[in-house]
């Protein structure tokens, strides 16, 4: 990668005269570019209009090499290309001098030239130019950029099944954003939320996607240069199917099919009994139907987290053959089925990595998706797969699941580390995952920053930030260093403040409940000690929202560290109840305090106490006692969250790209206020179970303005009950706003399951 500014025609040394976009301009696109719909030219015209109010003309052209071009960029005049149209921006191909996906962008006073080694290279160059236009128009810096990605496959993985089904309109909007940040693959994850024929008992009431939705979205993605890849659970994660009357006999534990629905159990008990002959036919049916809707040859069969394999109906077979052999045999059959139909199978690699003997039993043409989500992840498992000779994507996470607010430090640390390891060990792709466990309570817009982190690191994982060797600066293809440096060249006195903020409080989800890893730092302490995360947040805020202060994303980052009682805690509290007043021991065994940043010794002690509880009331009290070091800080957390909301709102009001800010900021503010209510719920529940001693006045003050203190006495159980009821009412009012925001980007889906948790907590406060 090179970034070279031209010498200035006038002015002080080191301060080149910027290039002014003309009042009347044209964008010309070489007809050899595979962009029949003119998407790239239209993207540029749209961004120029948004930045300047001027609508440029668009022309298609046939470039002729070897002749002087009317707008030849003087900084890179050879080879020149003649055009039939006088255009200020030219898009063209030059496969003789540039590699596939590589591009060269020249901004000169005589015009702008975007050249690609292939169509995707042109697309990549156009996206860099768009980012510069968004930050600098109408005056752009003079420069030449030549660049290509570290990873040829830069994918995003979107959960559309664990409670939330995005609308087709929102999916298209998200694909637009992925294109801007140079992603070229999107995997859409389905368990039960697709309208498969003859499986209506599985998908009923979930607002399932239809075949026409997939066909339309596949076409839309293809026009943007994004490969839409099907991803369907075909082994594990069949919780909803295994609860139906028609299909329960295919599960490891069909006798449990009528247990009360639970977010916790949904993540644990969902594995097919592969000794049942119909199971393979069931998986084949899903594959055969779904793959027909996509133009890609790739297919992700998933195959992850098969926790119950060999524990239920298949236990005798496991005792005879071993779980590893059973797993490898079933996955191999699925992969061969796809290969015989001209498809390229891929699968999640967690089981194979934990049982490495599986790696030698799988077909050679299978791509392993090596998901490793711990913020402090090491390179061992990436090296293991590389040494086994298996092609792999390394897969990181945006860290939004199970919470209202995104854990941006965890996301950045995980994404940046893993991108380096993948390059080191020759990974063939980089995939950023966006999960929605526990009902997908996380608003889809909370993933924007993590998505951009991933785009940056997939493009240039070895770049530097603030002089610190690390992963992911903006000199690649996301929160682009090009665009950032361009903005610096045009705005000499640009503000770059992170701003002072209160010390962060414990996060509700530090650590990694997927791998058992731990965060780099004590809960609540920003993990990016070298300042790289803060700098990336600032750059994301500027390129995405036009927020030069960085305050929008930085406030969101800080808010995630103010969790005294989180969504996962509310789910745990409710689902400790079997549904009939008895303690749910299976749910209790899934609760790990390590994901809250507590030390291993402390977490193990309280987890053992929880499992030793004899009834529901004792279990809930024990859970709250274990979490009490966080819960008692609710007042401090809510005061800080109020400050975060004000900082975020003020920064959004000053943002130059108000349209983009208005699209996301309401969801951010709602998440912050929701967390304030959740913190109060934890405080009231802890008081109700005699875990802490607070009076009504303490609770009202802890609300930081959400509840006015009562003029009467705040002592006594009646006053505490009254303020708890007011918390319940406030929580329910907030939830109606949350529902409105949900419906703005998602179908109704399984919103009622989230409502059930919210209302059960509200009812507990009233009891």
Name each region found by the language model.
Residues 1-154, 417, 424, 429, ...:
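Contiguous, structured surface segment used for ligand recognition
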Residues 2-4, 9-15, 28-30, 34-42, ...:
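Substrate-binding groove of N-acetylhexosamine-processing glycoside hydrolases
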Residues 58-60, 230, 347, 394:
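A structural preference for short, hydrophobic beta-strand core positions in alpha/beta folds
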Residues 63, 192-193, 234-236, 352, ...:
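Conserved beta-strand edge residues that scaffold enzyme active sites
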Residues 64-67, 79-81, 196-197, 201-203, ...:
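Beta-rich nucleic-acid/ligand-interaction surfaces
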Residues 123, 237-239, 309, 438-442:
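Short catalytic/ligand-binding loop motif for oxyanion handling, primarily in non-cytosolic enzymes
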Residues 144-161, 394-401:
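N-terminal small/glycine-rich loop or linker at the start of catalytic domains
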Residues 152-349, 359-361, 367-369, 378, ...:
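Substrate-binding cleft of carbohydrate-active enzyme catalytic domains
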